[in-house]
Amino acid sequence: MPPFSHVPVLADAVVAGAEHLPHHNGVLIDATLGGGGHSALLLERFPGLRLIGLDQDPTARAAAAERLAAFADRVEILATNFASYTPPAPVLMVLADLGVSSPQLDVAERGFSFRLDGPLDMRMNPGSDGETAAELIDRLEENALADLIYGYGEERLSRRIARRIKADLAAQGPYEGTAALAYAVAGCYPPKARRGRIHPATRTFQALRIAVNDELAVLDRLLQQAPDWLETGGVMGVISFHSLEDRRVKTAFLQDERLERITRKPTVATDDEQNRNPRSRSAKWRLARRVNGC
């Protein structure tokens, strides 16, 4: 398999979402291009669509360019974060898949994985000069770190975990890598709780990743800006993977006068898809339409 092999989640729901468009001759913005899986399906299904794909991860952009080579004359890939982008003209559809892709999780050097040992980094753009996860946990005081782990990870043991992390740093210096941090977090759980389907470090790693990449603030900017990108009748679809994201998307689609909800309740993966692709278990798809006069 190629180094950035990635199975798009809720693919049928995304393609079905494009059926709500008033026509299919215009621009699709994939705000989180990744490996290009969703975009490839949409370009194949709707020959009149043209793609502007945004991603700050150079590995993802290279993989997407390869995957979308058959549609090269209809594709533009930009090295940017969706929060800092504005399209030159109204577009038909905006798509965002908010999850960390499997290839990013499966490459130890990226520092996202608690199962594979790697540097404690977690930056979506590893070439940036932004703060790494290692620098973040070193900088924060114990109470602030606990608040972060609770607020962004919804981790009920956040105080105990923050205390353990700061004690480790004081006693032995920086963690050698992600495995050492994951081991420390797991040690804060009772032995029986360490054997569940969900790894004990999942919520803590989620919290650190969100903080390092300012993910919720970036999502808020997308939800504020993207409706203005759409032509009347155009649609915006978002795939979220945890409740912090989904609540924001749900609230924006419900309260934004520029939008009309198409999905009243989120679409989730079928049992079959969840069995084939465990990553899809927590995925939720919401879709809204741009309305006129706002």
Swiss-Prot record:
GO MF annotation list: rRNA (cytosine-N4-)-methyltransferase activity
Enzyme class: transferase
InterPro entries (UniProt xref): RsmH, SAM-dep_MeTrfase_MraW_recog, SAM-dependent_MTases_sf
Subcellular location: Cytoplasm
Keyword list, A-Z: Cytoplasm, Methyltransferase, rRNA processing, S-adenosyl-L-methionine, Transferase
Keyword Heme: no
Catalyzed reactions: cytidine(1402) in 16S rRNA + S-adenosyl-L-methionine = N(4)-methylcytidine(1402) in 16S rRNA + S-adenosyl-L-homocysteine + H(+)
GO CC entries: cytoplasm
EC number: 2.1.1.199
Main location: cytoplasm
Gene Ontology annotations of biological process type: rRNA base methylation
Gene3D superfamilies, A to Z: Putative methyltransferase TM0872, insert domain (1.10.150.170), Vaccinia Virus protein VP39 (3.40.50.150)
Chain segments carrying region Disordered: 265-285
Highest rank taxon of the organism: Bacteria
Binding positions for S-adenosyl-L-methionine per the UniProt entry: G36, G37, H38, D55, F82, D97, Q104
Family: Belongs to the methyltransferase superfamily. RsmH family.
Role summary: Specifically methylates the N4 position of cytidine in position 1402 (C1402) of 16S rRNA.
NCBIfam families (UniProt xref): 16S rRNA (cytosine(1402)-N(4))-methyltransferase RsmH
Name of this chain's protein: Ribosomal RNA small subunit methyltransferase H
